[in-house]
A protein has these predicted regions:
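Short, surface-exposed linear segments at secondary-structure transitions and domain or protein termini
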Residues: 61-69
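Short arginine-rich
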Residues: 68-82
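Intrinsically disordered, low-complexity charged/polar segments
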Residues: 78-104
Length: 104
């Protein structure tokens, strides 16, 4: 039986759906994997040949935002995210989207 998330020391603990437009102005949808590490949380996403890993942050939300910021640096726009899995539990797409304003 797996440990509850509050006891899990390291590894993937959440998956967040990320959607938006890629630098070629094509829509995309991927998963940001949020991992617990010794110093906090970090997120990562793969898009075609690109792997983006955010900085280590103290909260899950900050870890997701770190990935979004890096995607924006690569030219991704109209980005929004929402949690889809907490551990093994599917959230049935009931969570609210978080929209991120484009960089000027």
């Amino acid at each position: 039986m797996p440990l509850p998330l509050s006891f899990k020391k390291e590894g993937t603990i959440e998956r967040h759906q990320v959607e938006g437009m890629d630098p070629s102005d094509r829509s995309f949808s991927r998963s940001i994997l949020v991992n617990r590490v010794a110093q906090g949380y970090t997120g990562s996403v793969m898009y075609e040949a690109l792997t983006v890993t955010g900085s280590i942050k103290p909260t899950i939300g900050a870890a997701v935002f770190s990935v979004v910021e890096k995607l924006q640096e690569f030219g991704f726009t109209r980005i929004r995210t929402r949690p889809n899995f907490k551990g093994q539990r599917y959230l049935a797409e009931k969570e609210t989207w978080v929209d991120y304003p484009d960089k000027p």
